[in-house]
C-alpha cells in the first residue's frame, strides 16, 4: 500500500464496535452473489491460510496461479513461523488492516529469498474488493517490491456506491461483473495494478472489520497514526497453511457432539 484513502460515508445500517474513546462502527456486509472468482466458495484442495488472531480467526483462499511469487513467499514464511506472534501495526478504518512485519514498525519485512523483494504480480482476474488479501511494500517505499507484509482490504460496503464511480470503472475497462462486485462489496479499485492481490477472505470478515475499528493513536499534531493503541493491540498468534476446507473452527469443535 503506497497511500491512504479518503474515508467514505458509512452505511446507515451498522453495528457499534467497542473501540474506546474513538469508537468506530463496523459495517453490516450482505452476502454477494458474483461470477468473480474472489466471491466463489473455495474448491476442495484449494490452498488456504488460517490466521489465528487475538480478535478471532480469519480464513483466506490463496491464488498461486495468479500470484505465484507472492503466494510462495507468504506460504514459505508462514511455515517457518515468521508471522507467529507478530502484530497488526496498521488499522485504518474504511481502508485496510496491515501486518506481516516482524519488527512491528511497518518499515521492515522479509522474504524467503534472503530478503530480496519480488515483483508486482497484477492479475486482471483479481481486484481489491473488500476482503482481498494483498501484498504490500514496506512503509516509505524503501523496498522495490513485495516482502512479508500483507494487508486485508477493509473498505466499507458503500465505498464504490456512486454511479459516477461505477461509470469511471466501466470507462477504464472493468467488466460489468467487476463493477457490480465493487458496487456490492466495496473496495479500493485505485489500487488495482499497483499492489498484488494473492488471496481473498471467505470466512472471518467480521474479524477483519473488528481489527479496522480498534482505537488508534494520534501524533503530536492530533493526526491519526492508524496504529492500534497499546490496550487495543492486535496479535497474529499464528498463520496455518492448509487446504480447503481445513480443520473445523474452534467454535465448531466446541459445539460438536461425539
Question: What is the meaning of each model-derived region?
Answer:
Residues 19-258:
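Cyclophilin-like peptidyl-prolyl cis-trans isomerases
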Residues 2-3, 152:
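Residue-level detector of alpha-helical hydrophobic segments embedded in or interacting with membranes
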Residues 3-22:
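Sec-dependent N-terminal signal peptides of Gram-positive bacterial secreted proteins and lipoproteins
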Amino acid at each position: 500500500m503506497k497511500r491512504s484513502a479518503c474515508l467514505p460515508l458509512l452505511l446507515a445500517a451498522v453495528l457499534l464496535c467497542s473501540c474506546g474513546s474513538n469508537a468506530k462502527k463496523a459495517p453490516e456486509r450482505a452476502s454477494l452473489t458474483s461470477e468473480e472468482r474472489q466471491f466463489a466458495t473455495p474448491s476442495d484442495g484449494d490452498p488456504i491460510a488460517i490466521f489465528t488472531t487475538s480478535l478471532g480467526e480469519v480464513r483466506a483462499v490463496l491464488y498461486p496461479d495468479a500470484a505465484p511469487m507472492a503466494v510462495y513467499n507468504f506460504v514459505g514464511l508462514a511455515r517457518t513461523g515468521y508471522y507467529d506472534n507478530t502484530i497488526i501495526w496498521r488499522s485504518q478504518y474504511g481502508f485496510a488492516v496491515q501486518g506481516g512485519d516482524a519488527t512491528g514498525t511497518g518499515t521492515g519485512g522479509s522474504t524467503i529469498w534472503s530478503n530480496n523483494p519480488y515483483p508486482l504480480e497484477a492479475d486482471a482476474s483479481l481486484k481489491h474488493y473488500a476482503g482481498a488479501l494483498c501484498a504490500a511494500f514496506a512503509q516509505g517505499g524503501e523496498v522495490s517490491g513485495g516482502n512479508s507484509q500483507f494487508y486485508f482490504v477493509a473498505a466499507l460496503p458503500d465505498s464504490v456506491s456512486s454511479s459516477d464511480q461505477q461509470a469511471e470503472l466501466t470507462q477504464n475497462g472493468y467488466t460489468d461483473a467487476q463493477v457490480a462486485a465493487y458496487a456490492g462489496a466495496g473496495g479500493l479499485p485505485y489500487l488495482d495494478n499497483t499492489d498484488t492481490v494473492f488471496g481473498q477472505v471467505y470466512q472471518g470478515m467480521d474479524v477483519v472489520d473488528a481489527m479496522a475499528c480498534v482505537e488508534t493513536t494520534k501524533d503530536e499534531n492530533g493526526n491519526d497514526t492508524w496504529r492500534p493503541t497499546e490496550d487495543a493491540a492486535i496479535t497474529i498468534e499464528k498463520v496455518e497453511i492448509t487446504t480447503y476446507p481445513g480443520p473445523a473452527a474452534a467454535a465448531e469443535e466446541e459445539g460438536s457432539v461425539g
